[in-house]
Amino acid sequence: MIRDLSKMYPQTRHPAPPHQPAQPFKFTISESCDRIKEEFQFLQAQYHSLKLECEKLASEKTEMQRHYVMYYEMSYGLNIEMHKQAEIVKRLNAICAQVIPFLSQEHQQQVVQAVERAKQVTMAELNAIIGQQLQAQHLSHAHGLPVPLTPHPSGLQPPAIPSIGSSAGLLALSSALGGQSHLPIKDEKKHHDSDHQRDRDSIKSSSVSPSASFRAAEKHRNSTDYSSESKKQKTEEKDIAARYDSDGEKSDDNLVVDVSNEDPSSPRGSPAHSPRENGLDKPRLLKKDAPISPASIASSSSTPSSKSKEHSHNEKSTTPVSKSNTPTPRTDAPTPGSNSSGLRPVPGKPPGVDPLTGLRTPMAVPCPYPTPFGIVPHAGMNGDLTSPGPAYASLHSISPQMSAAAAAAAAAAAYGRSPVVGFDPHHHMRVPGIPPNLTGIPGGKPAYSFHVSADGQMQPVPFPPDALIGPGIPRHARQINTLNHGEVVCAVTISNPTRHVYTGGKGCVKVWDISHPGNKSPVSQLDCLNRDNYIRSCRLLPDGRTLIVGGEASTLSIWDLAAPTPRIKAELTSSAPACYALAISPDSKVCFSCCSDGNIAVWDLHNQTLVRQFQGHTDGASCIDISNDGTKLWTGGLDNTVRSWDLREGRQLQQHDFTSQIFSLGYCPTGEWLAVGMENSNVEVLHVTKPDKYQLHLHESCVLSLKFAHCGKWFVSTGKDNLLNAWRTPYGASIFQSKESSSVLSCDISVDDKYIVTGSGDKKATVYEVIY
């Protein structure tokens, strides 16, 4: 099966001139130039054909990866369903055993025999049951979808799976997919040609070996396609090993899980639309990061933690230990009609039940196969890759052990809004669970900001004319300095007046003088906690003379910055193994620490004693903020709740329940609004006394930090997607957006609202000047 390469590499490139032995063979300069030009044109044509061949192979490899991810999710669903059904059978057997003794003797014998007969299911019976269900579902879909879907030989839609609870449907699907292993992937490729030019620069497909069925399916292809593919796979396997080695060297045991999900060379053109519009010119498919599956919860987190490790990559977790509450991948997107952030879940509806689970597929699989989690059939899913911009750069590092969440994060395209560091402006509606009729405002453009009323109705927000203009509203931000800390920067804070920046990494806080931009070295280094423990939060007292530092240790360090050499003047010890966040009361008398055990510790800074603990969070408390008058405290936790506390009475006031873990929050200095950043990539802005809220959708991954400007008119959020977003309070008009080279784990805004500092996973902090 060796492919004839004569078409691609003809042996005789140019017709030979007639042989004239009697006449000497001479070239003039003009003829030589013509021949060189001719040769160049030929090489150019050869290059073009090779380039097309390469693109074709790359696109087919991407298709293979999508199918692999689909099978991965399907096998996971089958495994869960199998265990579920086994548990149900066990319980029913126990009930039968308890009930049978109450029957009469003759009935007991009959029932026992009937139970034994019921347990004896033959393969013939199983095949008949599966065949009947398969036929019924084929017929139902033939009526429901009159237009044949080309990737299927008969034009019939494969059996859809109504829910994970249908084991027969799952079995039917698996057998159907096995039987249709000859589907022509190459034909499907035509449906994607318009996307490949755009995609090939940024999605690098992982070197996953195709399954046997797909190898059989591709026999009709030219043999060299696969030989080229196998060579490419071997090369990529080496690349993967090299990539993991280099990541380990630069990120300390792969602490930063997110550095590989963006291509540094991705296009960064300016956005082609007005930022005040709540949407874009081109309506697109819904797209969203995948729910995090249990196999990759640790590896998909984004700020350091001492607790969890991902065994498959020996990778430290970088969030406050992110947990799933159920064995199935969590669908953490708030949905219209469900009171996702109400004070309590609606009685009768189990928490976590999301009717639009299907819209949160782990990857925008461009074939009409449903996944085991009830994917809603969508016309655009058939052969339409929803990843818009850079989409061929980082499936390269996805191994079979990694979850679909990682694949989705890698395939997620970037969305650009601002002239700061613009990039691909198509965000493709990364809005989970929003019906198609809500994907735009009257101008016909998809929206990213939605108002959610008390009854759960979602409507795109029409921005007012002054959304992005007026006093106190920035125009953009300019990067003016980079502070090379040397470790992942998990905490930053700015002094008042704006002169020093404090960056917290592993085992120390470094102090930088930003009044001299040319100064590339820290003015001092404050060693605290243990050398291997990450600083998670550092807070300055309003007088600027005291710094409090907390992190992956049970102690908080209090630093005296007014001394000739900064020194630790006290340490506060709690029972929790880690502190995730700190807040200081306006009068500087009290410090609040978010503990990994879910408690909020209240410290008397004068007497250096623990005076109280607020108990309520059932998992780690991850973020905190305090009202300007010092009477109310807001905390967010990994238990999917945000709680408010009355500091005068020492009791909990409110509780807001979400379907996703809370990673960051900020309370507006002017009151009324609370912004919450979540694991599911949403930012929600809640009114503190009314049930209304806004839901904002520009982040591609976990929202790791959030901070309000001191004027209260705008706020910033940062995420695992490398983005710094600035939003208008409260409705979330995008003011500007900047993209960094790695996960942005922390941020702070100066008291005069003129500077922003961010800390990132590539071991540096970045200083921005806010331009008004």
From Swiss-Prot:
SMART domains, A to Z: WD40
Region of interest called SP domain, as start-end residue ranges on this chain: 276-452
GO CC terms: nucleoplasm; nucleus; transcription regulator complex; transcription repressor complex
GO molecular function: transcription corepressor activity
Tissue specificity: Expressed at high levels in the spleen and ovary.
Matches recorded under InterPro entries: Groucho/TLE_N (IPR005617), Groucho_enhance (IPR009146), WD40/YVTN_repeat-like_dom_sf (IPR015943), WD40_repeat_CS (IPR019775), WD40_repeat_dom_sf (IPR036322), WD40_rpt (IPR001680)
Alphabetical UniProt keywords: Nucleus, Repeat, Repressor, Transcription, Transcription regulation, Ubl conjugation, WD repeat
Region described as CcN domain: spans on this chain: 206-275
Biased composition (Polar residues): 318-329
Renumbered residue ranges of the record's region Q domain: 1-137
Superkingdom of source: Eukaryota
Coiled-coil zones: none
Modification(s) after translation: Ubiquitinated by XIAP/BIRC4.
Basic and acidic residues bias locations: 184-203, 216-253, 274-290, 307-316
Region annotation Disordered: where it falls in the sequence: 1-24, 183-359
Stated family: Belongs to the WD repeat Groucho/TLE family.
Oligomeric form and interacting partners: Interacts with tcf7, tcf7l1, ripply2.2/bowline, dscr6/ripply3 and foxd3. Associates with tbx6 in the presence of ripply2.2/bowline. Interacts with EFNB1 through the SP domain.
Official protein name in the record: Transducin-like enhancer protein 4
Annotated organism of origin: Xenopus laevis
Lineage, uppermost ranks: Eukaryota, Metazoa, Chordata, Craniata, Vertebrata
Encoding gene (name): tle4
